[in-house]
Amino acid sequence: MAKTVQDILAIIEENDIKMVDFKMVDIHGQYRHVTIPAENFSEDTMKSGIGFDASNYGYAVVEKSDMVFIPDPDTAVVDPFCEIPTLSMTGNAMIIDSPENRPLAQYPRNIIQAAVQYMKDSGVADEMQILPEFEFYLFDDVTWQVEGRCVGATVDAKQSYWNSAVEGHGVVVPKQKNYHIAKPFDTSYECRSEMCLLMKEMGIDINYHHPEVAASGQYEIEPQLGEVVHMADATMMIKYIIHNTALKYGKSATFMPKPIYGEAGSGMHVHMLLFKDGEPVFSDDNGYSHLSETAHYFIGGLLKHIGSLCAITNPSTNSFKRLVPGFEAPVTVGYATSNRSAVIRIPAYAKSPNKRRFELRNPDATCNPYFCYAAILMAGLDGVKNRIDPHANGWGPYDMNLYKLPEEEKAKLQGLPVSLDEALDCLEKDHDYLTAGGVVPEALLKNFIAAKREECRQLSAIPHPAVFDKYYNL
């Protein structure tokens, strides 16, 4: 049941709340916030909103940057990281207009809601559920420096193999042998457990948490399936909880896809399924891997647009250092059951009709989740609309280890973009599926591409320490 203003006022009184914090997201997927004293919160706050400068969020030009933020009462939670009792809410950005404000089309939360409405209008489904997997590193120490005479970074995790020579330590994990390792080698169990308990308190149900492959402090937390807009909100809150809880334990968390060369990268695999009138759209006992024709067309849309999707689902230059062979990261455009070398995997363990689904394995958590999930939905719906058959297009199913194919066979396969610049090229050429129905504004795509091009330019101009190995003595 939806919360009302009276419900929020009751929460404020019951918890002796002193501050109300409004969390918004910028174009890159970073939380920003503005806070008001609790006594200033009223029904007018919910209607008129809180003013902010949208140009600093990447959504507007300076001369037309006044917007208002309208909180969504259903997102209200007590923030456990504030010493002063604080109620937190997220919501939507609106353009100031008369007689009524109207939604800011470029704001990512508005976009995912528009994508869901587009899905409903299409008649394909009335609900999308997703399950993003959160892989991340916890470091005990991290330093970096980017100056003219010094460019470098150093990380440390006490349980890592590189600390085997530290006197009196002894508890270390061999390289790439951290997966599901138990105590005493799992040195972050309490930290992750507290993260999950906090998520539960904030309305996010969890399946499990565990150590991931990389011995240098890599872990995973997996929530349960949930409605896509709720899970976009949850994605932001999960990252917020992980970052803040890590600091409490004297660690820092990073969702960088590839913080350490030679170690497993961190992704954010996204499982997905659709429902219509409460019935699973993707289930068919007679289909390949028990998936329906609609599910296969949805897969076809994802695979057709995977190049441009990568600009949104993997929007950092570091993202493409993860998408390389040898670390269970996808590099090939294709689908199959239980195959982690293809970009789409159908989990064999999802046997119940209400759980039959597939996962897109290339995304990572440097994305803006609202934009990411909306783009995934729009690509899939385009596949359904245009009946894009993944098998007929030569994208599988690939029921073999694609990493171990002979080179001449690998050469026949379509690969993912190898850089952010290449993915942005794809997005510039292929984005009509995103703008269909006015879901993603052209203006946002233009701003996003320009911002990411500038990132690529800046980072490519900085000499990497590894070039000294190659060129210093020539």
Segments from the language model and where they lie:
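Glycine-rich, acidic/polar active-site loops that bind/position phosphate-bearing ligands
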Residues: 2-474
